């Protein structure tokens, strides 16, 4: 993050604008909306600024910039067509530790103006850090079409009710749940219809009904790593959570999407290394929910595919706590897709089998005879530790030693690492594989060299297109 987003209170604060042309006028009109006390340093004013001056909207010094003009001002904006003068304004501001903006000359700016969506008191600011202003404008236009016009009045009413809600609901978590329900329920629906009086009545009724004290648990699949693969429902629950218990397999990019003030607890597991025993995780889920909290159990991939999600929900259900499950893209689907390996193919594989290489009791309970049959794909989770045994057993039971295999490390992440080879060399590949890693066995692996795409093309352009097309 190159620039820290800040919202400045400019009401009755002096702001110096150097320049009296149309560019300065556009900045001044924006400053006026924020209530700034505007001072203009320029020998002449364009018609638009002269009109504002006559209406009492600005003070005009009527002379060229002098450093002394920076005394006792809050911000300074240079908006002239004289590059040397603009640079001088910036340098003088820097010497006085004042924030300065030089229009269309980012190197001389200590702050920049974002693209703005105004639904006052809701304001959305979008910035490309000065690198792609056209992209920022396109994003603003897209969001303008998505964000409803009633957001401003709804926020104003919510602000007027904050004091009453705080008096009636003492806990911060309780107040947050009240507002989440109101802003996603009847109150918001009435606001959308323009029925302001009825909307306030709905707030009154909700407040009189009292806060909801019951906690709940949401078991959410975080997907294989790329935050773009997270489901919308999962994101919504992560943004509403009071506390999030997450595993090591959840990527930092996904964790970054958790609500900022939610408590985060690492309940991670790696092979041979458990930061928290499974029974303790089960107990903690129940305890936190019984405290009235919204708990998200965030697990890599899909929580019901080798994620012990079923075990955890058994404990939650036994305690009588409400719960829900949000599926995630499992690693076998996500990692292979990003590696250009289709799990099934009419010419190579008519079935796919998911296998765990880490059995609960450590015993060999796999049907190797069935797994060694051809024309199927094997996706083995946590298989690198037992790669030698897997290779040996499959070959012993009839699978060709030349069967193509892949070991995919950090699948779907920017540092994804794919190794390919044959079944007889699986152990050597596994020894070089960073974890977490997925083992894929089958003829479909050979297609990796034809249709591998991730990291091979201009992904920056692809991702930008997906962001721009929000609607």
Swiss-Prot record:
Which pathway does the record list? Cofactor biosynthesis; adenosylcobalamin biosynthesis; precorrin-2 from uroporphyrinogen III: step 1/1; Cofactor biosynthesis; adenosylcobalamin biosynthesis; sirohydrochlorin from precorrin-2: step 1/1; Porphyrin-containing compound metabolism; siroheme biosynthesis; precorrin-2 from uroporphyrinogen III: step 1/1; Porphyrin-containing compound metabolism; siroheme biosynthesis; siroheme from sirohydrochlorin: step 1/1
Locate the Phosphoserine modifications and list their residues: 128
Report keywords, A-Z: Cobalamin biosynthesis, Lyase, Methyltransferase, Multifunctional enzyme, NAD, Oxidoreductase, Phosphoprotein, Porphyrin biosynthesis, S-adenosyl-L-methionine, Transferase
Annotated catalysed reactions: uroporphyrinogen III + 2 S-adenosyl-L-methionine = precorrin-2 + 2 S-adenosyl-L-homocysteine + H(+); precorrin-2 + NAD(+) = sirohydrochlorin + NADH + 2 H(+); siroheme + 2 H(+) = sirohydrochlorin + Fe(2+)
Where, if anywhere, are coiled coils annotated?
none
Kindly list the biological process annotations in GO that this record carries. cobalamin biosynthetic process; methylation; siroheme biosynthetic process
Which superkingdom does the taxonomy of this entry point to?
Bacteria
* The keyword Signal is annotated on this UniProt entry: no
Q: Which residues bind NAD(+)?
A: 22-23, 43-44
Q: Where is this region: Uroporphyrinogen-III C-methyltransferase?
A: 215-471
Active site (UniProt): 247, 269
Q: Which InterPro entries does the UniProt record give?
A: 4pyrrol_Mease (IPR000878), 4pyrrol_Methylase_sf (IPR035996), 4pyrrole_Mease_sub1 (IPR014777), 4pyrrole_Mease_sub2 (IPR014776), CobA/CysG_C (IPR006366), NAD(P)-bd_dom_sf (IPR036291), Siro_Cobalamin_biosynth (IPR050161), Sirohaem_synt_dimer_dom_sf (IPR037115)
Where is the stretch described as Precorrin-2 dehydrogenase /sirohydrochlorin ferrochelatase?
Answer: 1-203
Reported EC number(s) for this entry are: 2.1.1.107, 1.3.1.76, 4.99.1.4
> Quick one: which residues bind S-adenosyl-L-methionine?
224, 300-302, 305, 330-331, 382, 411
Molecular function (GO) terms for this protein are: NAD binding; precorrin-2 dehydrogenase activity; sirohydrochlorin ferrochelatase activity; uroporphyrin-III C-methyltransferase activity
- What's this protein's function? Then it catalyzes the NAD-dependent ring dehydrogenation of precorrin-2 to yield sirohydrochlorin. Finally, it catalyzes the ferrochelation of sirohydrochlorin to yield siroheme.
The UniProt similarity line reads:
In the N-terminal section; belongs to the precorrin-2 dehydrogenase / sirohydrochlorin ferrochelatase family.
Query: What PANTHER family does the database record attribute to this sequence?
Result: SIROHEME SYNTHASE, SIROHEME SYNTHASE-RELATED
The protein's name? Siroheme synthase
Instruction: Please name the taxonomic classification of the source.
Output: Bacteria, Pseudomonadati, Pseudomonadota, Gammaproteobacteria, Enterobacterales
Q: Which gene encodes it?
A: cysG
């Amino acid at each position: 993050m190159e620039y820290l987003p800040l919202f400045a209170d400019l009401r009755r604060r002096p702001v110096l604008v150097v320049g009296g042309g149309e560019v300065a006028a556009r900045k001044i009109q924006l400053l006026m909306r924020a209530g700034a006390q505007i001072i203009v340093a320029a020998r002449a004013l364009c018609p638009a600024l002269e009109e504002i001056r006559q209406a009492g909207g600005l003070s005009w010094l009527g002379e060229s910039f002098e450093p002394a003009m920076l005394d006792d001002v809050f911000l300074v904006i240079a908006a002239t067509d004289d590059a040397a003068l603009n640079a001088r304004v910036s340098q003088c501001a820097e010497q006085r530790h004042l924030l300065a903006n030089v229009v269309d000359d980012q190197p001389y700016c200590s702050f920049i103006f974002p693209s703005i969506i105004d639904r006052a008191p809701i304001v959305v600011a979008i910035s490309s850090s000065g690198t792609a202003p056209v992209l920022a404008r396109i994003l603003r236009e897209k969001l303008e079409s998505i964000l409803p016009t009633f957001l401003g009045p709804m926020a104003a009413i919510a602000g007027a009710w904050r004091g009453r809600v705080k008096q009636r609901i003492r806990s911060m978590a309780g107040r947050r749940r009240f507002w989440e329900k109101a802003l996603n329920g009847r109150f918001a629906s009435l606001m959308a219809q323009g029925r302001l009086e009825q909307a306030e009545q709905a707030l009154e009724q909700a407040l009189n009904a009292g806060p909801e004290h019951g906690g709940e648990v949401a078991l959410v699949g975080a997907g294989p790593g790329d935050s773009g693969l997270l489901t919308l429902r999962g994101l919504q629950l992560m943004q509403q959570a009071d506390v999030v218990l997450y595993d090591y397999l959840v990527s930092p990019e996904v964790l970054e999407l958790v609500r900022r003030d939610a408590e985060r607890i690492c309940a991670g597991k790696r092979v041979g290394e458990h930061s928290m025993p499974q029974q303790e995780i089960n107990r903690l889920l129940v305890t936190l929910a019984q405290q009235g909290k919204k708990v998200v159990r965030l697990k890599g991939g899909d929580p019901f595919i080798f994620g012990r999600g079923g075990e955890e929900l058994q404990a939650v259900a036994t305690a009588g706590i409400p719960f829900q499950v949000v599926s995630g893209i499992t690693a076998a689907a996500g990692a292979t897709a990003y590696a250009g390996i289709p799990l099934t193919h009419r010419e190579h594989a008519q079935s796919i089998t998911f296998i765990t290489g880490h059995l609960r009791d450590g015993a060999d309970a796999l049907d190797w005879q069935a797994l060694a049959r051809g024309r199927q794909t094997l996706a083995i989770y946590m298989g690198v530790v037992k790669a030698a045994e897997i290779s040996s057993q499959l070959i012993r039971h009839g699978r060709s030693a030349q069967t193509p295999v892949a070991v995919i490390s950090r699948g779907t992440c920017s540092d994804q690492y794919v190794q390919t080879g044959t079944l007889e060399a699986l152990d050597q590949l596994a020894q070089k594989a960073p974890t977490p890693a997925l083992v894929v066995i089958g003829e479909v692996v050979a297609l990796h060299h034809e249709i591998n795409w991730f990291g091979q093309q201009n992904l920056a352009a692809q991702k930008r297109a997906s962001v721009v097309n929000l609607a």
